[in-house]
């Protein structure tokens, strides 16, 4: 009597002889931290397969007082998904509720959470990148230049971030409450106050230098990729070449991608000659994190 091939396959699968097929996973509204009883949530995507996958933690912008995990950073979702990366898009406390360094601590909490749940979500803990844009870029720049064993990442991708906060403030010396972006002035505790600075005087300038990632670069930090439009009207393009040069001078790795004619925000990069950041970013991440 000849065996039925289909029956044989089904029996083998039932007996665990064939590995189960692990499907892609998309989950929303996952709590990753609760500072002062305030739940912080993330959305995630995990690709098809057993993994372990490289992953990215995504940090949105919005002038430190606006934005969510579902805004501004969204163009990276499809890019990373199509490249076989898992990703985790996070919220963090916004001014005036969450000033510096509370927002930094929230990003660090997200790193610890992803590392702690790496097995559950099929993540390679040694291949986690931080990706941030605008205000979120400042946060990933800061975390990347101040990493600890618990918050260590393999790479940082920073889109048009203000790495030199004093230079950013000097742009608006006559209106220091607007030193980052116009949005933050909506709150009485926003602007310079959100960073522990009362006035743009000598003490204030010293404080801004102290919290600027450009002044914290060191040889042991993770590799950085900076992506910036050279027509940015909110965070000057000059911020990124200066930051990248400082990183390289410190003995660490940095690469810069310039978006010709690009204004502030990846969502504004709609021209065909501005789309290369997608393939360039993926290629850089794979090379830097040794992803096959």
PLM regions: where:
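Positively charged n-region of N-terminal signal peptides that target proteins for export
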Residues: 1-6
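Bacterial N-terminal signal peptides
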Residues: 8-19
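Alpha/beta-hydrolase superfamily serine-hydrolase fold, recognizing
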Residues: 22-292
């Amino acid at each position: 009597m000849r065996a039925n091939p289909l029956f044989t396959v089904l029996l083998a699968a039932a007996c665990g002889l064939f590995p189960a097929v692990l499907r892609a996973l998309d989950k929303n509204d996952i709590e990753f931290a609760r500072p002062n009883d305030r739940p912080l949530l993330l959305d995630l995507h995990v690709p098809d397969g057993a993994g372990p996958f490289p992953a990215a933690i995504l940090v949105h912008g919005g002038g430190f007082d606006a934005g969510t995990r579902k805004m501004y950073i969204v163009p990276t979702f499809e890019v990373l998904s199509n490249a076989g990366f898992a990703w985790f898009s996070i919220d963090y406390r916004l001014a005036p509720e969450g000033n510096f360094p509370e927002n930094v601590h929230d990003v660090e909490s997200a790193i610890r959470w992803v590392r702690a749940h790496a097995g559950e979500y099929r993540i390679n803990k040694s291949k986690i990148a931080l990706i941030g844009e605008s205000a979120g870029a400042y946060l990933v720049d800061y975390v990347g230049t101040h990493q600890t064993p618990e918050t260590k990442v393999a790479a940082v991708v920073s889109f048009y971030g203000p790495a030199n906060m004093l230079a950013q403030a000097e742009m608006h010396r006559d209106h220091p409450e607007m030193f980052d972006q116009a949005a933050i002035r909506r709150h009485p505790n926003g602007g310079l106050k959100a960073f522990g600075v009362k006035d743009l005087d000598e003490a204030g300038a010293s404080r801004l230098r102290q919290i600027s990632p450009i002044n914290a670069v060191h040889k042991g930090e993770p590799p950085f990729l900076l992506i910036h439009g050279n027509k940015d009207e909110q965070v000057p393009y000059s911020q990124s070449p200066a930051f990248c040069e400082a990183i390289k001078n410190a003995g660490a790795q940095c690469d810069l991608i310039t978006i010709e004619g690009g204004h502030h925000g990846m969502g504004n990069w709609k021209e065909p000659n501005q789309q290369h950041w997608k393939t360039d970013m993926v290629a850089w991440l794979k090379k830097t994190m040794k992803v096959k």
